[in-house]
């Protein structure tokens, strides 16, 4: 398939040409691994019914953070790479809006689909100005913590979306309280159950325990990467002091799948982790979920892991 390179400032947007097949054109925009994971089943189903383009903002593009998930979840590579990461947060957010706007002008989608509350979702600002219908999955989530960057993104995207798809009745009520029309709000549930069930055989077949020398049920799985925990000194110190105490109390390995930013912060701080806390590079979808299914406990500040862990109970894993 021919490829087109379109210059935008000093960055490049790379996209595929699509033939006109008579189908409505849907543009799906992602930028982080939680979006890729949650949307995996949706993306594949959308390709059946729509002329679907998948755009990646580049917000978190690294093989271990993103690329491996396309492989594990049997997803085709993104059709569009925006390379929107800037020198700082402001530049990145500006690039996401600017580059996604240019993509929409070029590809002329009939609708745009985003999920969640990451900075990638801010791409819908351009869609609104271009009068392109916006569909927002995972709408209506609220934590009532105004210090959380995602809380601001949620409010922006919910308000300007044409159709909001909430995971729960609780989230729908938040949308209703905001004054959003009920006829454009739907409770769809989360797509995570389908994603996990579709990949269950591969998850169970993973040999990650053998590779890492871990015994099932006798380790703790740790994920800690959120900005408010890693970049705030007080929270950072409290968190990892608690992790060390946990390692001492339970006397078992704590496997820490460590985000590059978290690893850098630990190195800079000089904080000494307990010898039982094992840092490891980010793992793929099948390996990580196999570890999650068989852990003594999962400790996380992630939004995805608690949801995955709760779903595992439906397939016989407490």
Residue ranges, per PLM feature:
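N-terminal subdomain of nucleotide-sugar transferases
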Residues: 4, 10-59
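Active-site and donor-binding regions of nucleotide-sugar-utilizing enzymes
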Residues: 25-30, 35-42, 49, 69, ...
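Structural beta-sheet core signal
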Residues: 28, 54-56, 114, 136, ...
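A donor-sugar binding/catalytic signature common to diverse glycosyltransferases
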Residues: 114-115, 121-124, 136-137, 164, ...
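N-terminal beta-loop-helix "entrance" segment that forms/cooperates
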Residues: 60-76
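Glycine-rich phosphate-binding loop signature in dinucleotide/nucleotide-binding domains
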Residues: 21-22, 103-110, 214-215, 294
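Donor-nucleotide binding loops and adjacent catalytic segments primarily
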Residues: 59, 67, 204-294
């Amino acid at each position: 398939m021919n490829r087109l390179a379109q210059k935008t400032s000093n960055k490049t947007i790379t996209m595929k040409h699509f033939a006109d097949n008579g189908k409505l054109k849907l543009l799906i925009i992602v930028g982080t691994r939680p979006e890729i994971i949650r949307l995996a089943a949706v993306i594949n189903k959308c390709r059946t019914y729509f002329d679907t383009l998948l755009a990646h903002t580049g917000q978190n593009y690294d093989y271990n953070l993103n690329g491996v998930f396309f492989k594990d979840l049997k997803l085709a590579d993104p059709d569009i790479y925006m390379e929107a990461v800037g020198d700082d947060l402001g530049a990145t957010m500006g690039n996401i809006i600017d580059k996604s706007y240019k993509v929409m002008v070029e590809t002329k989608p009939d609708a745009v689909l985003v999920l969640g509350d990451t900075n990638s979702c801010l791409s819908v600002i351009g869609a609104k100005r271009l009068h392109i219908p916006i569909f927002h999955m995972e709408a209506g989530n609220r934590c009532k913590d105004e210090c959380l960057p995602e809380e601001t993104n949620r409010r922006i995207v919910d308000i300007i979306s044409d159709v909001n798809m909430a995971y729960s009745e609780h989230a729908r009520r938040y949308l209703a309280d905001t004054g959003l029309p009920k006829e454009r709000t739907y409770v769809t549930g989360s797509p995570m159950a389908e994603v996990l069930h579709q990949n269950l055989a591969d998850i169970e077949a993973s040999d990650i325990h053998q590779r890492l020398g871990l015994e099932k049920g006798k380790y703790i799985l740790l994920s800690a990467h959120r900005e408010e925990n890693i970049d705030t000194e007080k929270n950072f110190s409290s968190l990892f002091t608690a992790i060390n105490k946990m390692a001492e109390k339970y006397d078992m390995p704590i496997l820490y799948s460590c985000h590059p930013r978290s690893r850098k912060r630990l190195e800079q701080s000089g904080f000494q982790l307990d010898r039982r806390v094992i840092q490891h590079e980010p793992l793929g979808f099948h390996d990580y979920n196999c570890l999650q299914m068989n852990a003594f406990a999962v400790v996380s500040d992630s939004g995805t892991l608690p949801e995955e862990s709760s779903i595992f109970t439906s397939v016989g894993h407490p």
